[in-house]
Amino acid sequence: HRDLHSFPTRRSSDLDYYVDNAEEMKGKWGEAFADNSRPLYLELGCGKGGFAAQHALKYPDINIIAADIKADMLAVGRRTVENMFAAVGRTHDNIILLRINIVNISQLFAENDKVDRIYINFCNPWNRGKHNKRRLTHPRQLEQYKNILKTGGELRFKTDDDELFEDSVEYFKECGWEITYITRDLHSEDFPDNLVTEHERMFAEEGKKIKYLSALPPVKSK
């Protein structure tokens, strides 16, 4: 992939959109997109990229970074993005695939990089006790997310796993986040902003209820 030091302010259609040198992008994330005046969203644990690709196509006026630690997943994600965009004749100029360890996510964004929204969709539940701290909704992660969200920015969390969801609700409360919307059966509600991926459809067809919440981080004291 191309060295991102060479990213122009506006991205040409042939420029690579896969990033694995995230540390070098701190303070320069806007430069990775064709139009850095758009809102910036971040999906954590993007897997095969289906959600992020759908989002980028449906909302061309929003930039989205789709992050995962697994290179093999992101390789599938690249094909997903390319195929979905090619099918409608669009250039993928509002999506970046990012390979990172999300444990250190807050170290990769500067003040001018803050994001408007974070998505966490169907992440590994890590339900065995000693592994709970690996959860993307664990309090130590929520502490980082509040530092990279803009004022008024929100986090949206979706899962099919009951234990992860109930524990996460407690995590958000413990960390002072305000839960603004919550449902334990998303598909039974009229929620127009929901993008349904193949993953989510599969769970629903198996009879699993999809749990969802939106939350705002605690207001920082001045």
Task: State where each predicted segment sits.
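A short glycine-rich, Lys/Arg-flanked "PGG" loop and its adjoining helix->strand segment in the class I
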Residues: 137-151
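Class I SAM-dependent methyltransferase "Motif I" SAM/SAH-binding loop
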Residues: 45-49
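Conserved beta-strand signature within the Rossmann-like core of class I S-adenosyl-L-methionine
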Residues: 152-159
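S-adenosyl-L-methionine
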Residues: 79-112
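Conserved SAM/SAH-binding beta-strand->alpha-helix loop
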Residues: 70
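Short, small-residue-biased leader/transition segments that mark boundaries at the very start
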Residues: 1-12
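Class I S-adenosyl-L-methionine
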Residues: 170, 175-222
